[in-house]
Design a protein with these regions (language model features):
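Active-site- or binding-pocket-proximal scaffold segments within functional domains
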Residues: 2-549
Length: 549
């Protein structure tokens, strides 16, 4: 069995039952653009907000007394396998930056404004002695050290302030994606346990502190202490540092953007909803696409698709956070390469995204109902794809990439052979050594051949994986109809797929392009896996569990 996704856990099962239908009276989630969810502030918190906004109010900073200080501390927890430093070492056209890295790039930094970046689990983080491990990718190993490090870095900033300078406020903002979003939630949870409520505000070591904003992309815990506990995932990986994901009341505003089409079973979602109710300091927004279509991190042309769809969630998060006072630079003032990562002005991209949003029949309602509405659109497209009625531009692109790579590899091999022929001696003569010039040409041809072989394998594997997922999907749809014919009650997931297959209305071409050119297939990372395109992942609402598959 060949498995390409390092987050894979062999034979993982979830033996604990959960609801297969929406929870009665569940709070509303929404789709795409929506005003932020911010709880009512106390008089003390309103005062602290004005203090925190000092650096972005014209001339306010100059007027502030130098005997006082406001510490602005923003921490960015990247997702599993995401590492800004590793990506920035690549050439621009191969970078796969997450939205967390892009937001960190856009954040201000000076003597009063501190931004701290925490690399994703499974990647190198020398500051905590983590070289990046398979256990980090699969089980979240090292997340606890990252959370502690973020708290230590905060304490270090406080310790830097001279004794004669009064700290007026510690202003905290936090961002995270995937397990990094779980780390961000654990960070504010642990911070809250160290704080005391006083006069309508909060104190940290007798210093005024506020957690102004938490920006989260698609929270996934999947935290395990050993491979054995990971195999039987009865609690979705809510272990050790990830035991409690409830956001503390001290967080003034939380925005959680979640992936409408993620299907992988071992990527259970942790909603910010608790049972049926949303706390007043949080809002959840569905965005189309799978996990990394929302949080970012796909490489350009991965699966023959663009990696630009995540820019819609990126810009939305930036706008809400900026309006809330998070100290981002104005986008127009960012350096060119950073600004380019926010660009969503491509006409085809915008047309496809807008057409998709228009096609979603239910954009606001309980999370489960809105999820079903998004899934119905995707399954209408899958129905056409597996029937061959929808021309697959992404597959055609992969075929071109594969064929071009094969030609380039063959040309490089021919070049190597020609250089070797230059060295042929007479019969019985010793073959002479390469000259420096020949060695240089041969090494260049070898590199070209190896790179081309890698690109060929990548494109060919993607085509193979996509094809096998389509076959399994057809079997699953047939099973739904068989179950119904036997008088078995269908779940919300099964009813949604069946309704999509029986919907005879044509799917707009722009919606097809959305799925085919921009939205990825996260299940197809594997040559074999228990996850299927017909699956919906489990969603946790605190201690409650929606298990549609």
């Amino acid at each position: 069995m060949s498995v390409k996704d390092p987050t894979y856990i062999p034979n993982q099962t979830d033996p604990k039952a959960g609801r297969t239908e929406p929870m009665p009276g569940g709070g509303n989630a929404t789709t795409a653009r929506r005003a932020p969810g911010q709880r009512a502030l106390t008089a003390k918190e309103r005062e602290q907000r004005q203090i925190a906004l000092g650096p972005i109010v014209p001339k306010k900073k100059e007027a502030m007394c130098q005997c006082t200080k406001v510490i602005h501390y923003s921490v960015f927890f990247d997702g599993t396998g995401n590492n800004r430093d590793a990506e920035m070492a690549k050439v621009a056209e191969k970078r796969a930056l997450s939205n967390i890295a892009k937001l960190w790039n856009a954040h201000k930094e000076d003597v009063e404004i501190v931004r701290r970046y925490i690399p994703g689990v499974g990647t190198s983080y020398p500051d905590i002695g983590d070289s990046g491990t398979t256990a980090g990718m699969a089980m979240g190993e090292g997340a606890d050290k990252r959370i502690r490090k973020a708290l230590e870095l905060l304490d270090e900033e406080i310790a830097k302030v001279p004794a004669q300078q009064k700290i007026r406020l510690i202003n905290i903002t936090v961002f995270g994606f995937s397990r990094g979003a779980a780390e961000a939630r654990a960070f504010v949870r642990d911070l809250a346990t160290r704080c005391q409520e006083k006069d309508g505000g909060w104190q940290y070591n007798n210093l005024p502190l506020r957690v102004a904003f938490a920006g989260l992309f698609d929270t996934v815990c999947s935290a395990y202490g050993a491979w054995t506990s990971a195999t039987f995932s009865w609690n979705g990986g809510h272990n050790n540092w990830a035991e409690d994901m409830k956001l503390p009341a001290m967080v003034e505003q939380t925005v959680h953007m979640i992936a409408a089409h993620e299907a992988r079973r071992r990527f259970p979602l942790d909603s910010t909803r608790i049972d049926a109710d949303y706390p007043e300091n949080t809002v959840e927004i569905w965005y189309p696409g799978v996990h990394s279509d929302v949080g970012g991190g796909y490489a350009p042309q991965e699966q023959g698709r663009e990696n630009t769809i995540s820019r819609f969630a990126l810009n939305h998060m930036y706008d809400i956070a900026y309006a809330a006072g998070v100290l981002f630079e104005p986008i127009d003032d960012l350096p060119g390469p950073v600004r380019d990562e926010f660009n969503k002005d491509n006409a085809q991209l915008r047309e496809a995204f807008n057409a998709y949003i228009e096609a979603v029949p239910k954009k606001t309602g309980t999370m489960e109902e809105v999820l079903a509405s998004h899934m119905q659109v995707m399954h209408r497209w899958l129905k056409e794809r597996v029937a061959g009625k929808s021309e697959s531009a992404s597959k055609a692109r992969l075929v071109r990439m594969r064929d071009e790579a094969k030609k380039k590899a063959n040309a490089a091999r021919a070049q190597q052979a020609a250089i070797l022929m230059e060295q042929q001696g007479g019969y019985g003569e010793e073959i002479p050594m390469f000259s420096p010039e020949q060695a240089k040409r041969y090494d260049a041809a070898t590199k070209t051949r190896n790179d081309a072989d890698d690109k060929y394998d990548e494109a060919n594997d993607a085509l193979t994986d996509l094809g096998q997922e389509e076959r399994k999907y057809i079997w699953d749809v047939q099973d739904i109809y068989f179950r119904e014919s036997q008088g078995q009650k269908l779940s919300l997931r099964e009813r949604t797929i069946k309704e999509a297959w029986e919907d005879t209305s044509p799917l707009p071409d722009a919606v097809k392009r959305f799925f085919d050119l921009f939205s990825h297939d996260s299940v197809a990372h594997f040559n074999f896996d228990t996850s299927r395109l017909s699956d919906w992942r489990t969603v946790y609402f605190g201690d409650s569990k929606f298990k549609p598959s």
